[in-house]
Amino acid sequence: VEIKEITRRLCSDYADSILKNKDPAHGTLRNTILDISTLFSWAYRREYTESNPFYKFKLPVGRKNVQERRPWSDEDIRRFLTSDFVNKNEFIATAIALYTGMRLDEICMLKHKHIFEDLFHIFEGKTKAARRVVPVHPVLKKIIVSNDSDNEEYILKGLISAGYDNKRSCNFQKRLGRTRKRLNLPKGVVFHSLRNTVI
């Protein structure tokens, strides 16, 4: 099949086939589709195809991996935050999640101007309830102030937006996963489960 002949229906059949034969976790399937969508976007810009059939593709429902998640233990947190493998952005994001319970997307979108009156002001989120204010813990204040610079508007510096929805968290989330794996943290310990480990 030539690339121009690939339709949205074929994309759907492909995703269904992966689910049936490999039964991947939802995140694994999502990342696979995002990678293919990126390839089609490249092909579209170079006029190899007339559209990207994977653009805003709705994933089929597969197995849920909620049971894989578990709160971070004190030892998990210590190993991660004291590791030489963890860069400054990973350290700051993890600290913010621990002290606030924020989602990774929210943390990646935080700007220095969103902090005033010792509060994080969150203006974007999945729901209206996501728009809220969260107290800035004194520990976080020291960490963020020490990382501040005049020419950087975001708290997490240098993140490159990616994925079909162009999120700053896309590549960063993958990096966090690779770091956890490198540290041999338990499989169920993921960034999202920091929301269940709030200090």
Where are these regions (language model features)?
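Basic, Lys/Arg- and aromatic-enriched nucleic-acid-binding interface segment
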Residues: 26, 30-34, 45, 49-104, ...
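Short, contiguous acidic/charged loop-to-helix segments that flank catalytic cores in large enzymes
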Residues: 85, 123-131, 158-167, 185-190
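Conserved tyrosine-mediated DNA breakage-rejoining catalytic core shared by Y-recombinases
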Residues: 56-59, 76, 100, 109-145
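Active-site-proximal segment of tyrosine recombinases
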Residues: 106-108, 188-190, 199
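N-terminal core-binding DNA-recognition domain of tyrosine site-specific recombinases/integrases
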Residues: 1-41, 46-48, 163-171, 188-193
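Bulky hydrophobic/aromatic "packing anchor" residues in well-ordered structure
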Residues: 11, 54-57, 80, 155-156, ...
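Active-site/catalytic core of tyrosine-dependent DNA strand-transfer enzymes
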Residues: 137-186
